[in-house]
């Protein structure tokens, strides 16, 4: 996390809800900077950030259980506006003198809220006597309010569904305004931030860009930085931001493991050298990687081999440069908070980027992570701010291990070339059909299965290619994309006709869950 105060910010205290990140997304969408802190370190985070408002998240815990999480008292002593969501409402009530009981009437899913009284938080949105859809997910419920609170809305199973202490600017809801199933939820959060807390909402990528550049210059000084450039959006945006800050003090290294999409490495190198004047080393290590991967079928073993070889190769190239004091990395905010569990204690380990895990310690370098406060969509917006073309920023996610995990079973050069060609044709057809931006991720998979076919007058015995396409918001859940059959037939025909080694194409109609987006 950052180590500085943020004027006009919101602190989100995380009690372990699976949707706490969505609260942060809604706050950011309202143009306001926010940070998530686990409840164990919330007092420290409050003092550091110096926010103008606090939001208390939901939790899988029960407020009636001994030792269940609590908000630090400093929040209620501060005089700042507080918005408690689900568990956040319950712990606020208990800590301020109200009562909560383990629910006999559990409430999950869609519910309807009846507004009984007007409230400052409803301004321009709801009025007394109206009814609105919300999303509930709770077992416990408030049974007695603290002094100063009143009920402003109810549901059939939650008589204290929306409570308010307008004088102290404390608000609590039993439902989840952060999820899309509460249609007016984002506006409620926006009203709390703008109308109740008085925060302007002028946090922008332009402002973030200047702040990040200033911080990088202050951190790096006149020292050297090296950055692992994968060709993905995250590492590319990080590299451009660092380059804007320190110029020629940055050297980027692209380790080409031979597992990238067709022409990808060459295109990335050309773009950054020609258009952004970056000092970029292109290291062709494909023989080294594929040589060790050939015949390896276990997906976890593949990942470990790729990770180890990447570190070894990167380390060797960095030493040739004479070393550096700093390592640039495209860590995002979800990476920072992903490993923070409300049961995990105050000391947490931040997840390392898959490509450079272990490098800072091995090479005695400090990390420069200019994106660690941003979500993925914000990184894309920053990329546009930095001048990256939409065609690059809008590319589908691509895994660090590359085609190795889209080739189940043993890997060989021949299989990788077959897969690379099939994948290129599939993506070409998607673009021609105008579907690329409607799909979260699409790719081909080469199965370790051969089937009998007939081509011309001859019998064939060749591989099966599976096509995958999903829609998603954040990659946490996904549904398969519903193509029309004409498109699938056209793509399959091209692949079979143009790619030697494939004689059958199938389409994967598995959602996540129960499946994962990638096959390995």
Swiss-Prot record:
Pathway: Purine metabolism; GMP biosynthesis; GMP from XMP (L-Gln route): step 1/1
Catalytic activity, as annotated: XMP + L-glutamine + ATP + H2O = GMP + L-glutamate + AMP + diphosphate + 2 H(+)
Domain GMPS ATP-PPase residue range list: 203-395
GO cellular component: cytosol
Chain positions recorded as ATP binding sites: 230-236
Domain Glutamine amidotransferase type-1 as annotated: residue spans: 9-202
Keywords: ATP-binding, Glutamine amidotransferase, GMP biosynthesis, Ligase, Nucleotide-binding, Purine biosynthesis
GO molecular function, one term: GMP synthase activity
Catalytic machinery residues: 86, 176, 178
InterPro entries: Class_I_gatase-like, GATASE, GMP_synth_C, GMP_synth_GATase, GMP_synthase, GMPS_ATP_PPase_dom, NAD/GMP_synthase, Rossmann-like_a/b/a_fold
PROSITE patterns per the UniProt record, alphabetical: GATASE_TYPE_1, GMPS_ATP_PPASE
Top-level enzyme category: ligase
Enzyme Commission (EC) number: 6.3.5.2
Subunit structure of this chain's protein: Homodimer.
Matches recorded under PANTHER family: GMP SYNTHASE [GLUTAMINE-HYDROLYZING] (PTHR11922:SF2), GMP SYNTHASE-RELATED (PTHR11922)
Biological function: Catalyzes the synthesis of GMP from XMP.
UniProt-recorded name of the protein: GMP synthase [glutamine-hydrolyzing]
